[in-house]
Amino acid sequence: MRILFISILIVLMSVKVRAQKTKIIYVGDPLCSWCYGFAPEIAMVKEHFDSLHFQVVIGGLRPYNTETMADLGDFLKEHWEAVEGRSKQPFNYGIIEDKTFVYDTEPPARAVIVMRELNRKAEFEFFKEVQHLFYVENKNTNDVKVYLPLLEKYEVDPEEFENTFESSWAKMEVKKDFQLAQQMNISGFPALLLDHEGKLYVVCKGYAKADAIIGAIEKVVGQ
């Protein structure tokens, strides 16, 4: 898990991409602790630029990992404390005491992909709910059943969600997001990019405050 302590990077990278409407691209992972800390900031950015297209890319923090909290607990606790101290987001450390819990970030990432398929407009809100499930409620995010109580508000059928989650399609689709993040040379999360007038700008890598991000984007798009 790479942690980048930077407040804002304005146009770190500018590469040619296919021209399209201006778009904010958020690269993160539901089980990334800095992404959880970043959640209120990116929500404010999204709300401020509500006229711009907003795309979520699941980066893949530790997909297919087989290590348990017995292996990673001390390491994770140190990072969670740092995130909590900086972001003031609430953390429940109880799950670290479950030494049998396998810290595999692929299932919650896949759950977000399934929501994208079944109700795209709800994807970002669901992403944040998955973060809350893990970091506050300490739910087992490897189990599809923990997501089902969330679905009614999004008008998603639980059986359809579960079947899609277990499908080979979903398992392949989440890999596409991981690969897309790699193609954009993003290996640390969170990261925020801006696709504007045929160029792709890296706005920030790592945790940053909303006001700094908003100012950086406005300098590029001229708002």
Q: What do these predicted regions represent?
A:
Residues 30:
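Cys/His-enriched microdomains
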Residues 33:
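Cys/His/Pro-rich metal-binding microdomains
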Residues 36-134, 138, 143:
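Structural alpha/beta surface segment adjacent to cysteine/selenocysteine redox centers
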Residues 1-21:
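Bacterial Sec-dependent N-terminal signal peptides
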Residues 21, 108, 188-189:
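A structure-centric signal for secondary-structure junctions around beta-strands
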Residues 27, 38-47, 132-223:
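C-terminal cap of thioredoxin/glutaredoxin-like
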